[in-house]
C-alpha cells in the first residue's frame, strides 16, 4: 500500500454488502482501481463519487486488493451528461469501452486524458455520434487492432476513393477492387470520414454537421469493425443501439 494524490474519473459504482459501495475510478497515475467506501450514504465524499465526475483524489493505493479514499477535492461534475439521457448513453458507452480496453491497475495516462476530453466535449454539446465514433476508432489499437484507412493496401495510393476489404484488413483503390469481390462497397465518404476520425485530435475538433444518413453508414461500418476485430459485446452499446428510435418518440 502507498498514499498518493492523483486525478481520477469515476467509471461506476456498485453496492457492496448492506451500506458500503465499491467505486471504480480511472486514475491518471495508477490506472483503473476499485475503491472501497464504507457507509457510502454517510460518506462526505458520496456526491463526489457519482458517475461522470472527475476530481483530485488523496488515496491509499493497494496493488493487491481494494484501495481507499482519504479525500476528494477540485471535483468537476459533467452536469449535461447526467441530465440528458442521450448524451448519458453515449458517455456510458465510451466509459465501458475504456474499461474494456485495458486491464485494471494498468498505467495509461493517455487513455485517461482521452476519455476525460471526450466526456468534456460531450458535456459541452459537441455531436454525440461524432465524439463516440472518434473514441471507438482511436481506442482500437488498445484492443490490438491496427487499421490503415489512408491508403490502398496494394499500391499505397493515398488519394481516394477507397473501399474497405475485410479479406486484406485494409483499403482498396478502384484499380484493386477486383482483388476482393466481397469488398464492403462503402460510400467513399465513409472511408474519408473514418480516416479523419482516426487521425484527428480532440483538441482540434470543431462542431461539424454530418447528415443522419451518413452517420448511419459510419455507425454500421464501425459496428462491423468491432464485430470482426474486437468481438466484445457491451451492455451499454446494446442500450445505445436500442435508443435509435427514441428521439422521434420523445419530440
From Swiss-Prot:
GO terms for biological process: DNA recombination; double-strand break repair. GO terms for cellular component: bacterial nucleoid. The keyword Transport does not apply. The keyword DNA damage applies. Keywords: DNA damage, DNA recombination, DNA repair. Transmembrane segments: none annotated. Belongs to the RecO family. This is DNA repair protein RecO. It comes from Lactococcus lactis subsp. cremoris (strain MG1363).
Amino acid at each position: 500500500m502507498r498514499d498518493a494524490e492523483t486525478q481520477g474519473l469515476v467509471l461506476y459504482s456498485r453496492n457492496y454488502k448492506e451500506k458500503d459501495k465499491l467505486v471504480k475510478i480511472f486514475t491518471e497515475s495508477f490506472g483503473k482501481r476499485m475503491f472501497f467506501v464504507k457507509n457510502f450514504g454517510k460518506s462526505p465524499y458520496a456526491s463526489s463519487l457519482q458517475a461522470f465526475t472527475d476530481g483530485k483524489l488523496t488515496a491509499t493505493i493497494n496493488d493487491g486488493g481494494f484501495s481507499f479514499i482519504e479525500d476528494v477535492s477540485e471535483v468537476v461534475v459533467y452536469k449535461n451528461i447526467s441530465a440528458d439521457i442521450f448524451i448519458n448513453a453515449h458517455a456510458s458507452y465510451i466509459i465501458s469501452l475504456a474499461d474494456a480496453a485495458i486491464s485494471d491497475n494498468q498505467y495509461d495516462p493517455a487513455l485517461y486524458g482521452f476519455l476525460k476530453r471526450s466526456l468534456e466535449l460531450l458535456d459541452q454539446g459537441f455531436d454525440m455520434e461524432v465524439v463516440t465514433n472518434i473514441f471507438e476508432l482511436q481506442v482500437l489499437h488498445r484492443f490490438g487492432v491496427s487499421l490503415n484507412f489512408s491508403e490502398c493496401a496494394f499500391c499505397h495510393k493515398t488519394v481516394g476513393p477507397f473501399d474497405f476489404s475485410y479479406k486484406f484488413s485494409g483499403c482498396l483503390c478502384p484499380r484493386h477492387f477486383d482483388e476482393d469481390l466481397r469488398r464492403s462497397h462503402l460510400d467513399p465518404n465513409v472511408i474519408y470520414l473514418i480516416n479523419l476520425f482516426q487521425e484527428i485530435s480532440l483538441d482540434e475538433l470543431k462542431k461539424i454537421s454530418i447528415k443522419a444518413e451518413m452517420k448511419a453508414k459510419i455507425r454500421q461500418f464501425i459496428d462491423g469493425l468491432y464485430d470482426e476485430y474486437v468481438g466484445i459485446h457491451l451492455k451499454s452499446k446494446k442500450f445505445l443501439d436500442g435508443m435509435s428510435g427514441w428521439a422521434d418518440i420523445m419530440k
